[in-house]
Regions:
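Acidic, surface-exposed loops and disordered segments
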Residues: 1-173
């Protein structure tokens, strides 16, 4: 099977991570792949903030868990890297552009043997005063909104196999 297709068909969301860090070379490759995502009219609306400090990750995780409605949850599953993807809301394809950044990062991580998962609620996090303060601290302009998180690390357990695809996902008209 073609290497790219194999990567796309075998990638799974990892929801339990080892504490070992992701090597800088691999992390940089995943981030670069994100910057090469397709985007509307080449406007490159996405922006990636990379968190590796456990205290920073814990702060964001607490915010995410509260939005989720379960303050005791650990929605980042112990991942040692959390990448927050923002996009410039002045670009009319900002949601799509930011989503494709995450998609590229997920595929790139898998191709390098790094586990990953898309975590939602970024938009809500950065609409909060605490989130806006973080954006300011990180130098992310107010015109940006959170699209999602791409968590990265090495899987502590083998991800579940893919569910069979629904028969009606493709309609040939």
């Amino acid at each position: 099977m073609n290497e790219v297709l194999n990567c796309l068909l075998t990638r799974r969301s990892v929801k339990k991570y080892l504490p070992q860090p992701v090597e800088q070379e691999k992390l940089d490759a995943v981030l670069e792949a994100g910057t090469y995502a397709a985007c509307g009219m080449g406007r490159q609306a996405g922006k990636i903030v990379v968190l590796q400090n456990p205290d920073d990750i814990a702060q964001l995780e607490r915010m995410n868990a509260a939005i989720f409605g379960n303050p005791d949850a650990h929605p980042f599953y112990g991942a040692p890297v959390v990448c927050v993807v923002f996009a410039d809301t002045n670009v009319n394809t900002w949601i799509e552009d930011g989503s494709l950044v995450i998609g590229n990062m997920l595929a790139a991580a898998h191709s390098l043997g790094v586990g990953s998962c898309w975590i939602h609620r970024a938009r809500q996090e950065f609409e909060l005063p605490e989130g806006k303060a973080l954006m300011q601290k990180w130098g992310v302009g107010a015109q940006y909104a959170g699209v999602g998180h791409c968590i990265l690390g090495y899987a502590a357990a083998e991800p579940a196999p893919a569910k069979p695809r629904k028969a009606d996902l493709i309609i040939r008209a």
